[in-house]
UniProtKB/Swiss-Prot annotation:
NCBIfam families: opacity_OapA
Similarity comment: Belongs to the OapA family.
Up-regulation conditions: Undergoes phase variation.
Feature: compositional bias, Polar residues: 1-14, 86-95
GO CC annotations on file: extracellular region
Major location category of this protein: secreted
Effect of disrupting the coding gene: Loss of the ability to colonize the nasopharynx of infant rats.
Record's subcellular location: Secreted
Encoding gene, per UniProt annotation: oapA
Protein name as annotated: Opacity-associated protein OapA
UniProt region (Disordered), positions on chain: 1-98
Protein source organism: Haemophilus influenzae (strain ATCC 51907 / DSM 11121 / KW20 / Rd)
Keyword annotations: Secreted, Virulence
GO terms, molecular function: metalloendopeptidase activity; peptidoglycan binding
Function, as annotated: Cell envelope protein involved in phase variation, confers opaque colony phenotype.
Length: 431
């Protein structure tokens, strides 16, 4: 042990060289520079870094070798153990503070970007587009602008109310879809719903003319066949009408030459009682005419020349004027012949009795029997009809009278109610 102490003391003396014998200790710890990753690892690492420290020197003593020998020597390992905790705590605290500062700096660098983006979107008054407007009116302008856009979208997507009506009725001049006939080749007929009243009146007048034209022809044929003297009737009427238009004096002058002709008729022919009866009122009429002639001659003298001319024309055609009774008979015959003509027109209206089967509507029943379905539509519009046409039961009977044009003039229901066609094409409901 003594040899070891001597060697150490000799080596210590060589190092001192007469300089200051105070112990030399480092004033600042040397910290190794590490990266950010290394610093982050240092936060979680619990191991102690071993640092090389200088050995503690002993002060040189002169003459007291015994005391030096007797003093206990503290090994360097113990010194290291005592000094390490102090040095290590300071380094770890500095490392932790440095890492915290760097992490906080990075977080602070990211936060301003997010904070800068939020105010731009949340504050429209700071938008560059709205810099023209005052700052206090920018929010109001944006609210009004958004409301206008929403209204435009709403009205653009709103469906039109005419879509349903366009499918049911395409045009005002056409028959609705539900009332069109299945046979497309059949021409469309005019109804009160499709045409104005003026056109309906023209159609009714034409129909009446077409109905009465054949009646007049038949009546003319019957009269010409029965009476061959009908050709002379216009001349007789002209001769009879001319005295009525002239003054009473001219009428008296025309009746005077008729007397010999009428007196000759019973002599030439066999005396017949009706002829005598017809002549007697004419004689009585002559007396009244003579009295009127006398009064007229006193009042109007210059009219004699015209009376003579009329008398001459009446005397030249005594044969035509000699048969006034036959003309009256012919007129009566024409009236009698006109009655069966009206019966024939009534017979032209064909009547049908239709039975409503189960599950079939009146419109389908008309369609099956080749009737005009537009008449059903017109009947449904009659005042007071209500739901009569849609409340049929299976087995109900309907009597329909149709004219020569195929239109329904009258329809009688099983309960006694009737639908009567009017001149304008509409129907009247009668219970």
């Amino acid at each position: 042990m003594n040899s070891m102490d001597k060697n150490q003391q000799s080596s210590q003396n060589e190092l001192d060289l007469g300089l200051n014998q105070e112990p030399i200790t480092p004033k600042k710890t040397i910290q190794p520079s590490s990266s950010i990753l290394g610093k982050a690892k240092g936060l979680f690492a619990k191991k102690n870094h071993v640092q090389t420290n200088f050995q503690q020197r002993k002060e040189p003593t002169f003459g007291d070798s015994s005391t030096q020998e007797n003093d206990p020597l503290i090994p360097s390992e113990n010194l290291k153990k005592v000094q390490k905790p102090v040095l290590q705590t300071s380094s770890t605290e500095e490392n932790i503070s440095a890492v915290d500062e760097e992490i906080s700096a990075e977080n602070n660098a990211d936060e301003p970007v997010e904070k800068a983006e939020k105010p731009i979107l949340a504050q429209p008054e700071k938008w560059k587009i709205l810099q023209v407007l005052p700052a206090k009116h920018r929010r109001l302008f944006m609210a009004i602008f958004v409301l206008v856009i929403l209204l435009i979208i709403f009205f653009a997507l709103k469906p039109s109310s005419d879509t349903v009506e366009s499918f049911t009725q395409s045009n005002s001049n056409e028959v609705p879809v539900q009332f069109q006939s299945l046979d497309q080749s059949q021409p469309l007929e005019t109804t009160i719903l499709d045409n104005p009243p003026a056109q309906n009146q023209m159609a009714v007048e034409q129909a009446n003319q077409s109905e009465f034209a054949p009646k007049a022809e038949e009546a003319a044929n019957n009269t010409t066949a029965q009476n061959p003297l009908v050709e002379n009737a216009p001349m007789q009427q002209n001769v009879v009408q001319s005295p009525s238009q002239m003054p009473n004096e001219m009428a008296a002058a025309s009746v005077a030459p008729m007397q010999p002709a009428q007196a000759e008729q019973p002599k030439a022919t066999v005396p017949v009682q009706p002829m005598k009866k017809a002549v007697e009122p004419q004689v009585a009429h002559k007396d009244t005419v003579k009295k009127e002639v006398k009064v007229a001659e006193k009042a109007q003298a210059p009219a004699k020349a015209t009376e003579q001319n009329v008398a001459k024309t009446a005397g030249n055609a005594p044969i035509v004027e000699a048969k006034p009774v036959q003309a009256k008979k012919e007129k009566k015959v024409q009236i009698v012949d006109a009655k069966p003509v009206s019966k024939s027109t009534a017979s032209r209206l064909s009547a049908k009795t239709l039975t409503v089967p189960k599950g079939v509507s009146l419109m389908q029943l008309f369609r099956d029997n080749q009737l005009n379905i537009s008449d059903v539509n017109a009947m449904s519009k009659a005042t007071g009809a209500g739901n009569v046409l849609s409340s049929f039961k299976s087995g109900d009977k309907v009597t329909v009278s149709v004219n020569n044009q195929g239109r329904v003039n009258e329809m009688r229901l099983s309960n006694g109610a009737r639908f009567v066609r009017q001149s304008d094409g509409s129907y009247q409901y009668k219970k």
